[in-house]
Amino acid sequence: MAEAHKYKKLTPIEHVLTRPEMYIGSLDTTATPMFIYDEQKGHMVWETVKLNHGLLKIVDEILLNASDNISNRSARMTYIRVTITDTGEITIENDGAGIPIVRSREHKLYIPEMVFGHLLTSSNYDDDNQNAVAGRHGYGAKLTNILSLSFSVCCRTNGREFHMSWQDHMRKATAPRVSNVGTKEKNVTRVKFLPDYERFGMKEKKISNDMKRVLYKRIMDLSAMFPNIQITLNGSSFGFKSFKDYATLYSAMTPKGEKPPPPYVYESKSGCVAFIPSVVPGVRRMFGVVNGVVTYNGGTHCNAAQDILTGCLDGVERELKKENKVMDTNRVLRHFTILVFLVQVQPKFDSQNKARLVSTPTMPRVPRQDVMKYLLRMPFLEAHVSTITGQLAQELNKEIGTGRRMSSKTLLTSITKLVDATSTRRDPKHTRTLIVTEGDSAKALAQNSLSSDQKRYTGVFPLRGKLLNVRNKNLKRLRNCKELQELFCALGLELDKDYTDADELRYQRILIMTDQDADGSHIKGLVINAFESLWPSLLVRNPGFISIFSTPIVKARLRDKSVVSFFSMKEFHKWQRSNANTPYTCKYYKGLGTSTTAEGKEYFKDMEKHTMRLLVDRSDHKLLDNVFDSQEVEWRKDWMTKANAFTGEVDIDRSKKMLTVTDFVHKEMVHFALVGNARALAHSVDGLKPSQRKIIWALMRRSGNEAAKVAQLSGYISEASAFHHGETSLQETMIKMAQSFTGGNNVNLLVPEGQFGSRQQLGNDHAAPRYIFTKLSKVARLLFPSEDDPLLDYIVEEGQQVEPNHYVPILPLLLCNGSVGIGFGFSSNIPPFHRLDVSAAVRAMISGERAKSVVRRLVPWAVGFQGEIRRGPEGEFIAVGTYTYCKGGRVHVTELPWTCSVEAFREHISYLATKDIVNRIADYSGANHVDIDVEVAQGAVNTYAECESELGLTQRIHINGTVFSPNGTLSPLESDLTPVLQWHYDRRLDLYKKRRQRNLTLLEQELAREKSTLKFVQHFGAGHIDFANATEATLEKVCSKLGLVRVDDSFDYILRKPITFYTKTSFENLLKKIAETERRIEALKKTTPVQLWLGELDQFDRFFQDHEKKMVEAILKERRQRSPPSDLLPGLQQPRLEVEEAKGGKKFEMRVQVRKYVPPPTKRGAGGRSDGDGGATAAGAAAAVGGRGEKKGPGRAGGVRRMVLDALAKRVTRLLPRLLF
């Protein structure tokens, strides 16, 4: 009970006075750089002034009350008058609608008395009201009253006048005086107050000169926001006729007297945006106002305005690229100051301070073309624009432009993989051709198949590795692409040369020879893109300079030993349909390496038969820009979304000898794009990518489920499922599917036996595939019941049935495990959710709740995570690690966001150590638990929010989903996962209906067979069948006569029984079996599809409840015990924030709950207000010996002295807590 006196309950007024920083910011005066108006220079300057945020805020609250009255259209407002006396008394008066002078029926108080003298009174609580005002929380003017020595108000509204005054920080008040005045008297609201300057640290008890300048600038900002209202300070107006007048004040001459260009200003009803250029580059600065509120910390509106400018600069950059120029956008941005003044409906700020806008702004529709034209006129732009035909192009020409003049010997030594044509003489009968192959195996096929005569005028060059996209003449990227450099060198090309024909090159044609798959299409596209980007005239003026060599993808061998070749799967399938009764065997040629040398000789025997000439038109430049330019993301998204659902087929007629760029892009490149997305993006129903689906399917059909090495299993899976993309990628996929640590998989479909990775590196620390074992986990068959298998739609590859198009698990696995993937133009980042919450979501759907309502209650989570999920300022989710802050600066970190590895955290701490924020780290973490001690430097963090931010203990969780819908089309979901839940629910319920009907049919067929068998046995037992003299024909006649059921058009299931089947024991067993089958049929008839689903969900839930319990126990067992409460600093501990109330769905509550957003606290002492805190004592000791705050002395001696004092301060800081406690 001795500690009871420490606990106090404060009144609201006492709380504001005791903790004012929670409401208005710091009361301390600090040196703050900001825009300020310089009366002598007549324009704005960026200057450091002594600013008191709290004093500015209480004045601002009354100013904003006045400006909010502008939106009240019941009476026109014409002026706001501000007066500041020498003693510091401030008066703010405005006309307009005024405050109603009536008593509240509910509270029996006059409305002005409530508005100015009772906390939490406001007229802005109606969120349906579309007024653009600054007030929101009901504190405003009351905070000014509480923090003032005197406060009085006079309201004159509609013929009545109200007077009332307060003293002693709103604790004492006079009685309200109400009188009648003439109805013609103008409405007025006048507030007069004297701030408690001493409380704001101003010993002279009056306003400082710097604060007068700050308030002058603040009132000037308000005048710019509302130029139609006469706003004056001490009787003087600012004279702004428009926002442009105000924006011009930010333009300043250089020290050399250079005049800056005029600002770009755009004004609209929703606000104004200005881009103010400066001749000399500086630091990027932005200044924003929302409904009169100056957002000193920026916010979403400032970011949006900068995005507009950046987007326009990007547009300028694209235009310059067409002129063979490049621009340094970041350097150009440093020339601009951005102003954004917005009028917003119901704006949301990060706190009562309103220093940062967090809601999505409605920006003025700035005409971007006008801004681009404006930017192109900037005189400083030229300094940041350069041609790419400068030094880099010259250096590259030295490497790739001298090939034409190189001797064969020089080429032999410089490009070792080039097999050059054996003759250098030109033959008019034959075009000198360079065959460009995909890899060495294709090179071998070409080289081994060419005849001796063909080798005289044909060279071969293999492309190894991935080519780079050099669109827009990106020579920096070209410099990093050795493959293209050597190709251009072999051809003898020179950069920036306009070729009229190809005769001056070493080869007059290149023939691209790649695999007939999506990767081959990509290589063709990159080669075409490189030549069209760097030498467009060469392709336009020389049709067929780039040609495509096609080889069969399928060969069908008929009974007469004739062979039919097919160059596309579409062509093959068409032939199959028209020759359905023709017997044949087929061979698939996915890669060029499949072809034999004999087949290769056959191809090259008639080379032109297999060659398609590429025709390029000047208009194709724009189309290739859309496909390969990094800026054209939206076009590519639209391109692929409009494409048909992925079928795995290329729709190009290979019989034609000409191929246009348009056909290539829309029929072959789109094939690569869709295949790439199919590999990278998950299916909405089963949450799997094709490689994962192949692994599951192959392991399910594997006999037995014994663990095997990952390296061995990859070979089996690759063969069984017709996987064509290398066993290494398959092994990596298997390892990821087996990872079960926090942040790995919430549901691991494979079992990890060995080192499959840990939280140390988020799985990247796994052992080699040849050392680790895996097998299918038990949960796989819980999610994918074997009874589903016959009802799924399977893919046919190379003539064999492989994995399903997609599985239909009992839960949407995409929500359980999440999915991350980067495709072609699309990406996906879906976080995982608690698997039992996903189960509860499905149950809620079954009970009739709408998917949208259910998804709103789902909160991201990783199994084993010991932290919490908070709501962010913009409604997003934030994963937060856990720590305890101990005396002496020791921070015991016990959890990290699951997307942060322990190693990444250690690297971050190492960086903080270089900044003197952290002194040391002790890591006790294991494979799946976090246990780290960090010693933080004294004074480095002052609030829990700073501690979380500095140590990197928070991580925003982004939801941006693009998935394949049930019908196979790309479906961008953005942040709404409702379709995933709905699609899965529809498909799974439909599958249960089909499964129930199928099982019922199978049971009825089984019962008919059993009853037929019983009837035959009874007939035999009665002596009606003489087996000794019967033939098969007579027995079949007996069965037919008895009306027995046939199976596969025979009675073998009865007639092939062993003699022991006719014993009494077998007869009794048969009767029992029939009774059991009848019972199962009746039970299944009474069971609905929903009941089947719920039964399987129950099994899943029981399995994972036990699994999670064991996992959490193991984590807690490994971790060290927490520090005792006596060692903790209360002021720096993480708060237990209030849980958001879930809307609807009370029947199915979620395990994971999100905590409400609370604005981060402002700075305060590390140890709170307690005098006994070790942190506070250490800070005082550090200050006593010099510490961080001491100014540097002059010269070398001062620097040495400071180093000694700093070292001494650190030692005292570490030792004092041990001595005192």
UniProtKB/Swiss-Prot annotation:
Catalytic activity line of the entry: ATP-dependent breakage, passage and rejoining of double-stranded DNA
Main subcellular location: nucleus
Cofactor(s) recorded in Swiss-Prot or TrEMBL: Mg(2+); Mn(2+); Ca(2+)
Bound cofactor: record note: Binds two Mg(2+) per subunit. The magnesium ions form salt bridges with both the protein and the DNA. Can also accept other divalent metal cations, such as Mn(2+) or Ca(2+).
Ranges where the Toprim domain occurs: 432-546
Gene Ontology terms describing biological process: DNA topological change; resolution of meiotic recombination intermediates; sister chromatid segregation
UniProt subcellular location: Nucleus
Domain Topo IIA-type catalytic: 681-1097
GO cellular component terms listed in the entry, alphabetical order: kinetoplast; nucleus
Keywords: ATP-binding, DNA-binding, Isomerase, Magnesium, Metal-binding, Nucleotide-binding, Nucleus, Topoisomerase
Site entry: Transition state stabilizer: R770
UniProt-recorded Gene Ontology molecular function terms: ATP binding; DNA binding; DNA topoisomerase type II (double strand cut, ATP-hydrolyzing) activity; metal ion binding
Binding, Mg(2+) 2: D515, D517
Site location (Interaction with DNA): K466, N469, R636, K637, K689, S729
Gene3D superfamilies (alphabetical): 3.30.1360.40, 3.30.1490.30, 3.30.230.10, 3.40.50.670, Histidine kinase-like ATPase, C-terminal domain, Topoisomerase II, domain 5, Topoisomerase, domain 3
Compositionally biased residues, Gly residues: 1165-1177
Subunit structure: Homodimer.
Full protein name: DNA topoisomerase 2
